[in-house]
Amino acid sequence: SVNLWYSLPSNLIINLLTNVLIGLVSFILGSWFIYIVNDYIDRNADKNHPEKSNKPIASNKIPQKLIMLVSAIILISSVSFGLITSSSFIFILCIYISSMTLYSLIIKKVFLVDIISIAIGYMLRVYGGAIIVVNSIDETINVSIWLILCTGFASLFVLSIKRFSEITNDKLT
């Protein structure tokens, strides 16, 4: 039931909310790591862009050694927080970080595969959160496939509109 948590004892509710918060922080740190990696990979191309050239990494405002150190600390922190929750969550988190890093390195250059990859990233985030909830309450509960599919199709819809808008705007300029 959707409102199953209302009937739980207070210590289980606190455990659930704590695990959800830890998972949230873990995914935030993982996403932050990926953004840094992506900016680092794109730094040379961003230097020539009128807006992106002002980014700290593209404009060389941050030394490369510091970028590497901070990104390593963020990645280790993300995985460390994930380890607190459950093995199934850390598995999802590692797949997410790996696939989004692969996106930054290769996939973003492949038409349509790039938006599918981003949509899968959103699905992994939702699935990771659902895994935390299930593991905190009752491991016999199954995560709804509809939750994952609706997230995937909704993100594909939004990403397709964004892509169409980018293509249309590029043709106008």
Where are these regions (language model features)?
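Membrane-embedded alpha-helical segments that form the functional core of polytopic membrane enzymes
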Residues: V2, Y6-I41, S88-Y103
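Hydrophobic alpha-helical transmembrane segments
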Residues: W5-S7, S77-T85, L102-I106, G129-I132
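Residue-level recognition of pore/gate-forming positions within transmembrane alpha-helices
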Residues: F27, I74-I76, Y96-M100, I118, ...
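Acidic (Asp/Glu-rich) catalytic motifs at the cytosolic membrane interface
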Residues: F27-A58, V113, I161-T168
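Multi-pass membrane catalytic core of lipid/isoprenoid biosynthesis enzymes
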Residues: R43, N48-L93, I141-G152, L156
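Interhelical loop and helix-boundary elements at the membrane-water interface
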Residues: S53-I67, L102-I120, F164-T173
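C-terminal membrane-associated helical module and adjoining short loops/tails
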Residues: L105, M123, G128-T173
